[in-house]
Amino acid sequence: MGESWAARGAEGAPARMPLVLTALWAAVVVLELAYVMVLGPGPPPLGPLARALQLALAAYQLLNLLGNVVLFLRSDPSIRGVMLAGRGLGQGWAYCYQCQSQVPPRSGHCSACRVCILRRDHHCRLLGCCVGFHNYRPFLCLLLHSAGVLLHISVLLGPALSALLQAHSALYTVALLLLPWLMLLTGKVSLAQFALAFVVDTCVAGALLCGAGLLFHGMLLLRGQTTWEWARGHHCYDLGTCHNLQAALGPRWALVWFWPFLASPLPGDGISFQTPGDVGLVTS
C-alpha cells in the first residue's frame, strides 16, 4: 500500500533515529525475555508444561508485535500516490501550501513527515511515522500487544526481582528501583542485578504507557474521532459504536486484534467520510 517507510525519500537519517532506538530497546527486552524463558531465574522454577505454555504465549505475542510493526511501517498513510486533482470540491477540503495540493477532510500536514496525512491522528515519535487512515489498525494492535508483552515480561521477572529486594533494606529497594544506574556506578549492585531491575522498571513503565495509550485511542475509536478532533470537541463523524469500529478496523473488527495478517479491508478510502446523516443515525 504505497511506499514503505524505509523508501520514503523525504525522511532522512534523523527521522529514522527514533525507530532505531526503539528497535534497540525492543531487542534488549526480547533477549531478556528469552533469558527468562530458557533459564527461568528466581523462584518459583517453571515446570516443563508451564515453560511450554509460557514459550507458546511469548511466541504468539512477539509474532503479533512484530507483524503489526511491519504492517504499520509498510502502510503509507500520506497523500502520496493518491489522485486528489479535481476532487477538492466538497465541504471540508483545504489547500496545503507545503504540499501544493488540495487535501480532503480530516487530513493534516506533518512537519516531521513533510507531507499531508490522510485522516491524520498524530505523529508517533517512537516509530518515526504518522498514524493515519491506512495504519491506524496496526497502531492500535501494536499498543495492545506491546502492553501485553511488557506486562508478561514484568510478571516473569517479578519473582527474581522480589527475591533480590527481600534480601536488602527498604532504602536499598527504593534506590534500586528508582536509581538503578546510580546503584551500578557506585558498585552497589552487579551488572546482572542492574539489568534485572532496569528491564523490570522499563517494562512496567512501558506497559503503563501503552495501556494508557490503548485506553485513550480505544475511546477515540468508539467515538469515531481523531486526536485533533477530540481536542477540539468535534463529533462530526461519530456513526455509532459498531459503524465506528468497522470504519477503522474493517468488517472483521472483533478478530483483527488476535492476528495482524487477518484480511479485514477498510470500507473507506481515507478521502471521503460518512457522517451520521449519511447512515441515517441520530446523534445526541
Curated annotation (Swiss-Prot):
Record PANTHER family: PALMITOYLTRANSFERASE ZDHHC24-RELATED, ZINC FINGER DHHC DOMAIN CONTAINING PROTEIN
Record field: transmembrane: 19-39, 53-73, 138-158, 167-187, 196-216
Function recorded in the entry: Probable palmitoyltransferase that could catalyze the addition of palmitate onto various protein substrates.
Gene label: Zdhhc24
Membrane topology (Extracellular): 40-52, 159-166, 217-284
Keywords: Acyltransferase, Lipoprotein, Membrane, Palmitate, Transferase, Transmembrane, Transmembrane helix
Family the UniProt entry places it in: Belongs to the DHHC palmitoyltransferase family.
Reactions the enzyme catalyzes: L-cysteinyl-[protein] + hexadecanoyl-CoA = S-hexadecanoyl-L-cysteinyl-[protein] + CoA
Protein name as catalogued: Probable palmitoyltransferase ZDHHC24
Recorded superkingdom: Eukaryota
Predominant place of localization: membrane
Limits of the DHHC domain: 94-144
Family matches, as InterPro entries: Palmitoyltrfase_DHHC (IPR001594), PFA4/ZDH16/20/ERF2-like (IPR039859)
Enzyme Commission numbers on file: 2.3.1.225
Residue intervals annotated with topology Cytoplasmic: 1-18, 74-137, 188-195
Location of the protein in the cell: Membrane
A GO MF label: protein-cysteine S-palmitoyltransferase activity
Annotated membrane topology: Multi-pass membrane protein
Free-text comment about domains: The DHHC domain is required for palmitoyltransferase activity.
GO cellular component, one term: membrane
Active site, per annotation: 124 (s-palmitoyl cysteine intermediate)
